[in-house]
Each structure stands twice: as structure tokens, then as C-alpha cells.
Design a protein with these regions (language model features):
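Anionic-ligand-binding alpha/beta catalytic cores of soluble enzymes and soluble regulatory domains
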Residues: 7-92
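A conserved acidic, glycine/proline-rich C-terminal tail/linker
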Residues: 76-150
Length: 166
């Protein structure tokens, strides 16, 4: 759909939300193009649904998926909402056991502090925080969590956050 893409972005393949989807949506909403001009109709049986990992909350544990890697900083963004995490009744400064699996393989397990900002832990230390999407994030202060522990994203990457005894 080359004609429905922001001009001078033909060689850019990383910002389709901006260059293709938003641009085409704006043209469609403003009446500059019709549905037929967006592109060919896709058969319903060709639509692929991706699995969604459900968040599970148990007594002192919350489980979810690692959905997004913030590539600029190496932070992990999870499917666990702020409200789901709050079921563990966290206070800033509390420590939690964080366990990460790739399918069934253990990739990471350690105690991590819950903080307001990265400054709540020493440089090089991991931190649990609430990101701008109100989801649980996991990072290293001034480092890349993803690179340090070779963590990826997707429905096969699972995270467990367990409240430690007081």
C-alpha cells in the first residue's frame, strides 16, 4: 500500500504505526480515501490471532508475560498491570523475588527492589517499577536488563513476581 504511506518514508521499516497505519487512518477518517483504496480485503480465514498470556494472581505471587523490550534502555515491560501488581500490596523499597522463564527454562531469579525511580537503587542494580503504560517494568539502573540476562519478549517469556515474607 505504497500510496497510503507518509511521503519520504518508503525506506523506513520501523515506524509503521506512524508512517502507514496512522497516516492511512487519518486519510480514511478525513474522507480523502475510501476503504477500497486502503488495500485489498483480507479473507477472514487468513487473519492470525496471537496468543495472549493471562495474568495470574495468587496469594503472594503474580504471573504474566514479557511483552515489550524498551530497546533504547534494555528495560522489560510486562503484561502485569499496576492494579494486578498492587494485589501484592507493595510499598516502595519492598523486595520481591523475580523469576523469568523462556518456556520452561529458568533464565533469571533474584530479589529485586520496587522503586519510584531508578535512583531508588544503586547503579547496576535491578529495579521493579511502574512504567508509563501503568504496567510493571523491570530494569537495571544505568544498564540493560535484557542484555545482562539475555531476556527476550513474546508469549514464551514469562515472569513471576513473588512477595517476600516480612
Amino acid at each position: 500500500v505504497t500510496s497510503n504511506r507518509r511521503s519520504n518514508t518508503e525506506l523506513s521499516y520501523t515506524f509503521h504505526g506512524r508512517d502507514v497505519y496512522a497516516y492511512t487512518g487519518a486519510k480514511l477518517a478525513s474522507g480523502h480515501i475510501s476503504f477500497e483504496e486502503v488495500g485489498p480485503e483480507l479473507p477472514v480465514d487468513k487473519i492470525l490471532e496471537l496468543p495472549v498470556v493471562e495474568t495470574i494472581i495468587e496469594d503472594n505471587l503474580v504471573r504474566g508475560a514479557i511483552d515489550i523490550l524498551d530497546v533504547r534502555f534494555g528495560s522489560l515491560w510486562t503484561s502485569i498491570t499496576r492494579d494486578d501488581f498492587y494485589a501484592l500490596e507493595p510499598n516502595f523499597g519492598d523486595r520481591f523475588e523475580v523469576t523469568i522463564f523462556n518456556n520452561d527454562m529458568l533464565v533469571y531469579q533474584n530479589q529485586v527492589t520496587y522503586g519510584k525511580s531508578f535512583a531508588d537503587v544503586r547503579i547496576g542494580q535491578p529495579i521493579i517499577y511502574i512504567n508509563s503504560l501503568y504496567r510493571v517494568g523491570l530494569a537495571i539502573n544505568q544498564g540493560s536488563f535484557a542484555k545482562a540476562y539475555n531476556v527476550g519478549v513474546g508469549s514464551n517469556w514469562h515472569i513471576e513476581i513473588k512477595r517476600l515474607g516480612d
